[in-house]
């Protein structure tokens, strides 16, 4: 009986040590990620980054995204809902991480549409039609054009603007910043400089709510 009790005590002790170690490792990873983001704050937002929302909003969500990413497509309306529920209090900043093959061409389309002040309508049309132009995890940019009809875009001008060197530089800078911040998948979110502790809508929502609460103190 005594040996059985000792065994149970030892087992419980090992379990507690494991839980404590797991929590410590998780907290340490979160702290390291937050410290990295703080040290590399300049890499989070660039002057060229597309933004939505009031410039002085107390909460800034930075999203590294790929237009060919299915999860990015799913998260976009959810982030818009957060913004609608908190008017003028949240600003969204988009950064390009075209990890899918061919996605850089779709990013170039977005930047070309931006030159005609049609970035957000083009983005929403592109995301809505994503199942049509992403095939086998590869972006088929030529299939995107038909989904841009009706937006009032000069498509011929877009085709010419897509090859502009500054667009290539924007993509290169965003990818470089993604490497600096250790962004390896999309979407990747930072809220007021803090990365998500783990990926998920609930985690993003919690971090946003915390930032909103802090801004009211």
Question: At which residue positions do the language-model features occur?
Answer:
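Conserved strand-loop elements at the edges of beta-sheets that form or border functional pockets
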Residues: 54, 63, 198
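Structural alpha/beta surface segment adjacent to cysteine/selenocysteine redox centers
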Residues: 57, 62-68, 73-149, 179-184, ...
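Short clusters of hydrophobic/aromatic residues that line enzyme substrate/ligand-binding pockets
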Residues: 50-52, 133, 196
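Ser/Thr/Pro/Gly-rich low-complexity linker/stalk segments immediately outside membranes or between
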Residues: 27-42
């Amino acid at each position: 009986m005594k040996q059985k009790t000792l065994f149970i005590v030892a087992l419980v002790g090992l379990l507690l040590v494991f839980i404590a170690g797991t929590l410590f490792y998780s907290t340490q990873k979160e702290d390291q990620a937050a410290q990295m983001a703080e040290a590399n704050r300049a890499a989070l937002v660039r002057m060229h980054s597309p933004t939505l929302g009031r410039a002085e909003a107390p909460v800034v969500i930075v999203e590294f995204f790929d237009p060919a990413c299915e999860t990015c497509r799913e998260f976009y309306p959810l982030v818009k809902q957060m913004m609608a529920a908190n008017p003028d209090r949240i600003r969204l900043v988009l950064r390009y991480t075209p990890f899918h093959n061919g996605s850089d061409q779709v990013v170039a389309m977005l930047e070309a549409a931006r030159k005609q002040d049609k970035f957000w309508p083009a983005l929403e049309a592109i995301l809505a039609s994503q199942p049509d132009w992403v095939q086998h995890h590869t972006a088929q940019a030529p299939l995107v054009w038909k989904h841009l009809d009706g937006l009032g875009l000069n498509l011929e001008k877009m085709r010419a603007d897509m090859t502009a060197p500054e667009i290539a530089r924007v993509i290169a800078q965003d990818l470089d910043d993604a490497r600096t911040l250790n962004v390896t998948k999309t979407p990747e979110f930072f809220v007021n400089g803090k990365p998500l502790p783990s990926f998920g809508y609930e985690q993003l929502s919690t971090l946003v709510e915390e930032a909103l609460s802090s801004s009211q103190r």
